Regions:
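ABC-type ATPase nucleotide-binding domains, specifically the catalytic core motifs of the NBD
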Residues: 32, 54, 94-113, 122
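The feature captures the beta-strand-to-loop junction immediately N-terminal to the Walker
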Residues: 35-37
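Helix-to-loop junction immediately C-terminal to a conserved catalytic motif
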Residues: 50
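ABC ATPase NBD Q-loop/coupling interface
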Residues: 59-79
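Conserved ABC ATPase "signature" region
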Residues: 65-68, 108-128
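Conserved ABC ATPase signature
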Residues: 73, 132-136, 140-142
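Hydrophobic anchor residue at the start of the ABC signature
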Residues: 146
Length: 150
């Protein structure tokens, strides 16, 4: 089945187990929100799914392709997973458009820039493409972060 699948994911920091045998399936096209108390492992699970954190135990598959497991780690840029954290993590020295294209395989290509502008249009931020993050309100910065995820 297409989608994100986590199988038996466990993770520890300095011997403190924060994830213990977690299994989760998110069908393709679904939007998911993880809820739980501070420190319960939500962000760690997301970081493992996206490839930002090395998997210690278990397996992560996307569209039936193993992304992480014993002896395998596909880098984040090849996983096609977008995350939006509380801190929007916009780069202050980059324009809004450059923030949206950052990390993509060919950020300066016409196609990438066109697609990024489409995403900025979806969140009503295309007119701010050449501005820098400090010139935007918090809500506007959040919409830029959403465009980057999309």
């Amino acid at each position: 089945m297409k989608g994100l699948h986590l199988h038996g994911v466990s993770h520890a920091f300095n011997g403190n187990r924060v994830l213990d045998n977690i299994s989760l399936t998110v069908p393709a096209g679904e939007l998911v929100c993880l809820l739980g108390p501070s420190g319960c492992g939500k962000t760690t699970l997301l970081r493992i799914s996206a490839g930002l954190e090395e998997l210690q135990e278990g397996q992560v598959t996307i569209d039936e392709t193993v992304m992480a497991g014993p002896g395998r780690h596909v880098p984040p840029e090849r996983r096609k997973i977008g995350l939006m954290f509380q801190d929007y993590a916009l780069f202050p020295h980059l324009s809004i458009l450059a923030n949206v294209t950052f990390g993509l395989s060919n950020p300066k290509s016409k196609e990438t820039r066109y697609r990024a502008m489409e995403m900025l249009e979806q969140v009503n931020m295309a007119s701010h493409a050449e501005k820098h993050p400090h010139m935007l309100s918090g809500g506007q910065q959040q919409r830029v972060a959403l465009a980057r995820v999309l």
